Amino acid sequence: MTNPEQLKRILSHEVLLKIEMSKNGIVEYANPAFFELIGYEGDLFQCSFYEYLQSDDEHLMKKATDNLFRKSISVAHVFAFLRCNPIRSPNYYIQQAKAPFEGKTYIRMLFRGILVDSLYGKDTRVLWAGKYLYPQRSVINEMDFILFNTLGIGAFILHDHLLGIIKYNYIHVPPPSGKLCSLCEDNLPEWYFEVHSDFCLVWNDLVRRVFAVQQLINCKKLEIEDIVNKLPTGSNHMVEETFLSLPVITVFNGKKNRKQRFRIRSWRSSLNFLVKELDKSIKNFAYLEHRTFLTISNSAAKDMKREIYEKSLVNWEYDFLVPSKIQDYFYDVHSLLLKNLSSKIKLCNHILMYQATFNEVKNFLQTYSLNMLSIEMENIEGSLYFGNAQLSNLICVNQYLSEQRPVFFNRLLALGNVENNNSIYDDIQKRTERISTIKRHKKYFEIGERLTEKDLIVSKTFKTTRIDYFKAVKGSIEDLDVRPLKNRQKFVNKFYASIVHFLTESMQFPSHNDRRFGDNTPHSLDEFILLKEINRGAYGRVYLAKKRSSGKYFALKMIPKSSLDSLKKIKGLLLEKRNMHIQRYGPNTVKLYYAFDSGDYLCLVMDYFNGGDCETLIQKLGPLPEQWVCQYAAELLNAIELLHQDGIIHHDIKPANMLVDETGHIRLTDFGLSENVEEKKEVYKLTKRMSFEQKHGNLYEQLQPKKFEFVRYVRNYRGNIDELEKAESPQQNSDYANDSVQHLLDFDINNMDETAIHMLMNQLEKKENRTFIKKDISGTPNYMAPEILMGVDTQMGDIWAMGCVIFEMLTGTRPFEANTVKAIWARIERNDIGWTKRVKESCSKEAVDLITKLMDPDCNKRLGSNGYQEIKKHPFFRTIKWDNLNSGPGPFVPQTENVEDLTYFEKNISGSDNINKNNCQTSATLILNGIFAFHPPPKATPADSGTETSNSAAFSASEEETTNLTDQKRKDLFSLITKAFKGIDLKALNYNNKATLLRMYDEVDFPKNQQRNKEKFRIQKRPNKKYRYHLF
């Protein structure tokens, strides 16, 4: 049986896989989670889904797919082992297959599949939703296996709630409490929260893709309109415009099954035709915003999909007899319209899967709850249900029907879950017989009521004959008018109307229109209530803010646009947003949720923790106990490891950037100086390796037109960017080889926001020296590694800073203290760590050894250069359990009056001997100081030896090589920054949903039942009959 800790770790990493495949198993579409799991970088290649399954499971998947295409079933369930990349998956949900070969690893999953239409509606595909399934997972004996693995942790909550309904009068049992989904901000019942959050994540991702395509359509329309306005009024001035260079358009009429061909008479008319098609798509998108929602209604989902087909179907094709200058525009527009339709269809298919899952859960829930009632009915006192005639009679009669009770419930309720059951109900009606003689069964009915022949029904289904005994109680069955039943489920709903109503209403099932289509990204500060100022820096302030729609608290960072007066500052801000977005969120990093432009400010919405930071903790408490420091250092190392695995170097690790959350654990923040070096190196290699013509040809072969679409859009802004580059680099030729936006072809672009970020980052780089060794150095002087001062940028600089942080937390002072920045750097170069006799005696030998090895001046010999495991195995961390690092409360749990209490952020500089007011880490370098840059100092001179306040902001301003922007240049640049900056981070919001699941887990009492055998749940298929669960 799975222990609770293992289940807890599983919940925190579980994701929903979505795969669309053709009948022969070719993957036509899959969400990024699938490609990440199998270890493929990207999502554009077509592969065989069967190749990633274990050989034994391949046959089951093909059989289920064939049944779906033959429409013998509507929903299929398959347990299968999916091959995965062990590097991308945590060890605790990877297991070797039964017969491993070539070192491949597999994950056991439950796949749920339905049949969906393809792009043109001609062919059909199977949409599979995959969810991790773990062996030896705790199972509730009375609950259906599929229902359990669908609800996840909610199964335990539902089980406990139904037990309360049975034990007490259901009228007096409150409905399940609700939890707020961070993605959609809807309140969902706890038992359904995991199902909803999985589907909600995919739904939001698909919505973002629809928005991204629509943005490209808007840009393309503006571009073509601009070209039309620049065309001369007559065709005499255009020598290239010939009869053969005009497009031939083929229009298909689906209703009459005809097609019409015609040639457009001029280039102007041709471009106007494209503008008209784009305008039609824009109007349809406006309709979609008011129509599409995540629905549980099957009819609503199908109607929605049909309307999208009718309004967005691309019913025309084009052809050119000779190459033409406008040929690319036709290719771009036609590709965009197809992509627009494809993204909407994927969204509708996902809604159909959500609807199928919802109905499946609902049917299983009714069966499970009623079976559960039948099991527990013998121990219920009838007096608890006084006033409810149906339940009272049922409880009374149940004592006399104990022998036939399983037959009654199992036979009756099984029919409610048969898909497409109209034919079966007709068969039941034909096979139902009346029995005139009931004396032989009189021994089962002791109450003395007069029975009629309609009290007994012989049901002959699935070639079996069973006698279901119904007790006729006055005021219940006879009043319900039980005739030869045309629909058994109708009888169930009538006989247990109050229970069914309770399950569907009081259990707070989601409504039909709980999720409207739209972008949830905030658009202005009006969506937040600014409560208190948390901190301020050189270029902005951080406020405690409350979101009006959800009531959640966030830290809102506001950066005035007027403060971004140089390219370096703009680059630092975009890097902060970019690196917070691409990191894999762990329990020890601050998450970024939203970024938006609000008039005069650029805003970042992040995690809020009111426990203060470690710098304030050291100020108020002095040197921290070694047990505290050991836990804090381990959590800091965990955060650094995750960042480095994503190629992110933090550059500014210090106690002021280590926040304390409400449970006492560390959260690393402030990514203003961070940089993704690995990504830049890869981009540089791609740019140098391939010429523009090679890239152009390869991309056409790979059918990736979306990159060209955005490149042409970006070229509209090229003039503005080139003006900015003139201040930094010599004039370049304007040929294709030096095209300032050609590098965009090197990227895998999923939406325009990501593309704009790449483009801006590249434009803000120095053009005259294309190297990735930084000329300047970033960070806070006291925590800089020696190689950073030499201009060498490595990940080991963060490890050095970690050693400095451990030293400061243990001693209350920094390892390199001085009155000036230059003096600090001189001590760093000499490796003059502040090891006084008193300091060494106050630390353990293990702590001294760890700090010394972490601060080795040679980065190649520094502890951790051979992997982070050698740091974790150091004796200083011997008491740390790395698998359960963040379980339980931390060393110091903040005690605040309420969420808005900011007591722990109050500095106490005057009352502490450990913090020098004139030291190099002043308030100017705290949380908002994300764009300072420091350069190696020149050799000391007598004039430099005097006292100096050494404010890092003043030092940076005097030495920084900045390019000040004029008002016009800033205006032009901000037009691109707005597109690159705003966005919503689904990964961070989903992480919050997982945290909610973990808190729900902590409140669950896990049953100690024996694990049910998988084979026990295989329903034997009866020849030529539809069976209940379709489980393979």
Curated annotation (Swiss-Prot):
The active site is at 652 (proton acceptor). Its EC number is 2.7.11.1. It comes from the Eukaryota. GO terms for biological process: intracellular signal transduction; meiotic cell cycle; positive regulation of autophagy. It is found in: Cytoplasm. ATP binds at residues 534-542, 557. Residues 938-963 are annotated as: Disordered. It catalyses: L-seryl-[protein] + ATP = O-phospho-L-seryl-[protein] + ADP + H(+); L-threonyl-[protein] + ATP = O-phospho-L-threonyl-[protein] + ADP + H(+). Residues 947-957 have a biased composition (Low complexity). Residues 528-877 form the Protein kinase domain. InterPro entries: Kinase-like_dom_sf, PAS, Prot_kinase_dom, Ser/Thr_kinase_AS, Ser_Thr_kinase_AGC. GO terms for molecular function: ATP binding; protein serine kinase activity; protein serine/threonine kinase activity. Keywords: ATP-binding, Cytoplasm, Kinase, Meiosis, Nucleotide-binding, Serine/threonine-protein kinase, Transferase. Belongs to the protein kinase superfamily. Ser/Thr protein kinase family. Has a role in meiosis. This is Serine/threonine-protein kinase ppk31. It comes from Schizosaccharomyces pombe (strain 972 / ATCC 24843). The lineage of its organism: Eukaryota, Fungi, Dikarya, Ascomycota, Taphrinomycotina.
